[in-house]
Amino acid sequence: MNRRSFLRNTSSSLAGIGAGAAVTSPSIGALGNASAHADRFDPRALAKPKDYRKEPFGRLVILGESTVEGGPWLREKDQRYADVLVRLIDAVQEKPIEYINKGIGNNSISPRSPAYAQSVKPSAIERYQKDVIGHRPDLFILAYGLNDMRAAMPLADFREDMATIIRDVKKACDPVTVLTTVYYMTAYRGWSPINQGSIELTLKYNDCIRSLAAEFDCILADAWSAEGGADWLIDYDGVHANKVGNLLLGNKVFEALAQHCSGLTQYFFAQEKDSEWTKYTTRKRLEAGDPFKRTW
């Protein structure tokens, strides 16, 4: 697939801003040319994101493959995108979040994946009870699909296994659940036997993950759009995001969370409530007939 076709076929992915698929109304970015439509725009039609959590987070578990676990393509473990995310969360919460990284390199979603025989075990479906439910997180990130896509696992099997994990984790501890789309890569033929993937198959997997987010009311963090098809964000190995790519991925997940979890702003609002600036601006707004209203 050439670059022009790549961009044309991924336009819907690149337009996403990380909102869960359950939010179906148009976003601000989808409203088109503001000046052309301002005369007929109804503010009531503006999509408002669902608020999944009004309190700060206490414990994060991320379940994933090598990009989650990290490896020699990064000089330091804290360059992993999950670590980037944790630093962003800690920067806005009063108390740091407990961070449990359950990434395993060369991991598969389940024994049904064609990649399973040569993979590092146990697979996600063989370990989520212990690695996720056993820790009872209030924030859960499920980041799978890359290796199974590269092995050409049937989409129906992948979807069923993902659904089992999501359903069981929600039933057991009901965390805010984030699904990430499959990452961009460049070496689709370089690593036998998981060398059956392609951009086309990645797009199908990502549509599957979006549908799971919609069905199970999860937040979608669009890792694919974060990387945007930029080859320079991928390591020499052609598979893993490099340091800069991981910065983008971590920020994309944080963006999705911040847009859907008002609890991440709780500490800020408490700190600023009695500041001179807040007193001044809220007074001026009240005088103008436009008082501050907490809508969340």
Place the predicted regions along the sequence by residue.
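Short Asp/Glu-rich motifs
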Residues: A15, P26, P111, Y188-R189, ...
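N-terminal secretory signal peptides and thylakoid transit peptides that target proteins
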Residues: M1-I17
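Ser/Thr-centric signal marking residues that sit
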Residues: T10, T67-V68, T181
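Serine-esterase "nucleophile elbow" of acetyl-processing enzymes
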Residues: H37-G105, S110-R112, Y128-R136, A258
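Active-site beta-alpha loop architecture of Rossmann-like, nucleotide-cofactor-dependent enzymes
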Residues: S13, G105, N147
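Alpha-helical cap/lid subdomain in secreted, periplasmic
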Residues: R87, A91-K95, S119-W296
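C-terminal segment of N-terminal export signals and the immediately downstream linker at the start
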Residues: M1, A22-K54, E272-K273
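Acidic/histidine-rich helix-loop elements
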Residues: P72-K77, K102-S123, R150, P193, ...
